[in-house]
Amino acid sequence: MKAFLVLDNGMILEGESFGYESESVGEIVFNTSMAGYQEILTDPSYCNQIITLTYPMIGNYGIHPDNMESSKIQASGLIVREYVDLPSNFMSQKTLSKFLKEYQIPAIQGIDTRKLTRYIRTNGSPNGGIFVAREYSPEFLEKVKSFPGITGTDLAKVVTTSTKYIFGTHTGKKYKLAVYDYGVKTNILRLLDAAGFAVTVYPALTPAEEIMKEGTDAFFLSNGPGDPAPLDYAIDATRKIMEKGYPLFGICLGHQIIGLSLGKKTEKMKFGHRGGNQPVKNLSTGQVEITSQNHGFAVIDDGKSSEPVSFLNLNDNTVEGILKSGYPLLTVQYHPESAPGPNDSRYLFQKFYDLVETTKRGK
């Protein structure tokens, strides 16, 4: 079946459908990872986005339940150069095509993804849509232009859990950790549990006072989709957490929320960082880590906030982490849990546990 990729400037690219035969609109982004398409598709940070995978052949190893980062596909669509419908992997339980159809997600192959990626790098991430149809219709462009975009939209409310839940086991665990779910990935929860925390996950809108009353030793602010600026409730909760002196760890969107709560600003990036090969320098040690990233907004270091930067991206000098003098705080813009990506930064989960222990001993 034919499929059409339509951008908001009127560009039309024709290809072939290999997902659900429907249509979807969203922000068009690209990810440079060579593998990990299942983890990418199920990452809640991709809510309202259509993903272009730059690696030219996708689907080779199929789908396995252990590679899910949430309960479903979160992206709005998928764009690839060539789809492989015969996976070679003893663990594969289904094809990528079947997986997409189960969750009613359209996908298009036969697209010049190099050309599309170069366009995005030059012009910024456009709004666009995938439309599965026998012929092109002018209505497709109208639907793309009606998409409101990512900026100014609270997407954390869309992907957060509706109820509080316990992750892993609490038996024998010394410290309770409250996780704010703005779109948390499963592997983050696994690694927090493995670090020794008794993990409880809370909906994004849960008042900080309610969690404090229940009892916790520390807080974690998760990754999530879109623009952090509209999340007033999250910024307010973070300020209350810091007023009480709780140890705090934020990843990706969580890092941005902490930045806003400290008086810094955020901005939308031209095309963002999405892939598993971003070099980041730890400014306290001088060590460079290769990191997995997925974000389209960044904290600005405009010099107006006194809080120092702790990590820096070596490709474009964007802020990758911030500190607060005298406060038990750890933030990173990147994804230390990888899934997919390198494991260079997984030590941060144990580092946070040690930070909590040091803080509790000092009280």
From Swiss-Prot:
Residues the record marks as active site: C252, H335, E337
Chain segments carrying region CPSase: 1-172
Keyword Amino-acid biosynthesis listed: yes
Domain of life: Bacteria
GO BP of this protein: 'de novo' pyrimidine nucleobase biosynthetic process; 'de novo' UMP biosynthetic process; glutamine metabolic process; L-arginine biosynthetic process
Disulfide bonds: none
Enzyme Commission number(s) from the entry: 6.3.5.5
Residue span, Glutamine amidotransferase type-1 domain: 176-362
SUPFAM superfamilies for this protein: Carbamoyl phosphate synthetase, small subunit N-terminal domain (SSF52021), Class I glutamine amidotransferase-like (SSF52317)
Coiled-coil ranges (or none): none
Broadest EC class assigned to this enzyme: ligase
Name of one Pfam family that matches: CPSase_sm_chain
GO molecular function, one term: carbamoyl-phosphate synthase (glutamine-hydrolyzing) activity
Metabolic or biological pathway, per its Swiss-Prot or TrEMBL entry: Amino-acid biosynthesis; L-arginine biosynthesis; carbamoyl phosphate from bicarbonate: step 1/1; Pyrimidine metabolism; UMP biosynthesis via de novo pathway; (S)-dihydroorotate from bicarbonate: step 1/3
Keywords for the protein's UniProt record, in alphabetical order: Amino-acid biosynthesis, Arginine biosynthesis, ATP-binding, Glutamine amidotransferase, Ligase, Nucleotide-binding, Pyrimidine biosynthesis
Residues given in the record as L-glutamine binding sites: S45, G224, G226, L253, Q256, N294, G296, F297
Entry keyword Transcription regulation: no
Catalysed conversion reaction: hydrogencarbonate + L-glutamine + 2 ATP + H2O = carbamoyl phosphate + L-glutamate + 2 ADP + phosphate + 2 H(+)
Listed NCBIfam families: CPSaseIIsmall (TIGR01368), PRK12838.1 (NF009475)
Function: Small subunit of the glutamine-dependent carbamoyl phosphate synthetase (CPSase). CPSase catalyzes the formation of carbamoyl phosphate from the ammonia moiety of glutamine, carbonate, and phosphate donated by ATP, constituting the first step of 2 biosynthetic pathways, one leading to arginine and/or urea and the other to pyrimidine nucleotides. The small subunit (glutamine amidotransferase) binds and cleaves glutamine to supply the large subunit with the substrate ammonia.
Quaternary structure annotation from Swiss-Prot or TrEMBL: Composed of two chains; the small (or glutamine) chain promotes the hydrolysis of glutamine to ammonia, which is used by the large (or ammonia) chain to synthesize carbamoyl phosphate. Tetramer of heterodimers (alpha,beta)4.
Protein name: Carbamoyl phosphate synthase small chain
Organism (species): Leptospira borgpetersenii serovar Hardjo-bovis (strain JB197)
